[in-house]
């Protein structure tokens, strides 16, 4: 079961990683005036809630399967996402985006770094779980 969970974690984390890259590119495009604020907010707002939901579901799976350490690693980002959703500030506003662009870029870079580190952690744990499961067959 552990190997399948970490395979799923690698896949879900890749989706979130590419989402953060997409957000970062969109913020850079807005800064360079290649995209207008309404278009940026429309694109980003469609993806913010699914990104948080995927991360939350993955964290919940780790908690339910007894991987406490992995759950605790995910807890700060999970708490941050839940706090934003609870306070209803997860969506971007086109009228305020230029004023808050620096904050959103910093958040995107931090999440990008988090998901990149977690990708290698999940990959390592997946390989170790696959080796452990293949060792049980002999």
Swiss-Prot record:
Q: Which residues cross the membrane?
A: 7-27, 53-73, 112-132
The stretch of residues making up the signal peptide is none
Is Chloroplast set as a keyword in this record?
no
Q: Which InterPro entries match?
A: Cornichon, Cornichon_conserved
- Disruption phenotype annotation: Defects in cell polarity. Strains homozygous for ERV14 deletion do not sporulate.
Task: Please give the residue ranges for the topological domain Extracellular.
Answer: 28-52, 133-138
Transmembrane helix listed as a keyword: yes
Q: List GO molecular-function terms, semicolon-separated.
A: cargo receptor activity; signaling receptor binding
Where does this protein reside within or beyond the cell?
Endoplasmic reticulum membrane; Golgi apparatus membrane
Which membrane topology term applies here? Multi-pass membrane protein
One GO BP: negative regulation of receptor localization to synapse
Keywords for this entry?
A: Endoplasmic reticulum, Golgi apparatus, Membrane, Transmembrane, Transmembrane helix
One Pfam assignment:
Cornichon
Cytoplasmic membrane side: 2-6, 74-111
Domain of life where this protein originates: Eukaryota
GO CC, any one term: cell periphery
What's this chain's function? Answer: Could regulate export of the bud site and axial growth sites selection protein AXL2 and possibly other secretory proteins from the endoplasmic reticulum in COPII-coated vesicles. Seems to be required for axial budding pattern in haploid cells.
Family designation: Belongs to the cornichon family.
Q: What else is known?
A: Present with 7110 molecules/cell in log phase SD medium.
Q: Which PANTHER family match?
A: CORNICHON-RELATED
Tell me the protein's name. ER-derived vesicles protein ERV14
Source organism: Saccharomyces cerevisiae (strain ATCC 204508 / S288c)
């Amino acid at each position: 079961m552990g190997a399948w969970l970490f395979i799923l974690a690698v896949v879900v984390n890749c989706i979130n990683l590419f989402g953060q890259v997409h957000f970062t590119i969109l913020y850079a495009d807005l800064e360079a005036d290649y995209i207008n604020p309404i278009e940026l907010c429309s694109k980003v707002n469609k993806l913010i809630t699914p990104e948080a939901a995927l991360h939350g579901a993955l964290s919940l799976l780790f908690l339910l399967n007894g991987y406490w350490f992995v759950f605790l690693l995910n807890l700060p980002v999970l708490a941050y996402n839940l706090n934003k959703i609870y306070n209803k500030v997860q969506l971007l506003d086109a009228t305020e985006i230029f004023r808050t662009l620096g904050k959103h870029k910093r958040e995107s870079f931090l999440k990008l770094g988090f998901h990149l580190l977690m990708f290698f952690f999940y990959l390592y744990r997946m390989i170790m779980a696959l080796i452990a499961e293949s060792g049980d067959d002999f």
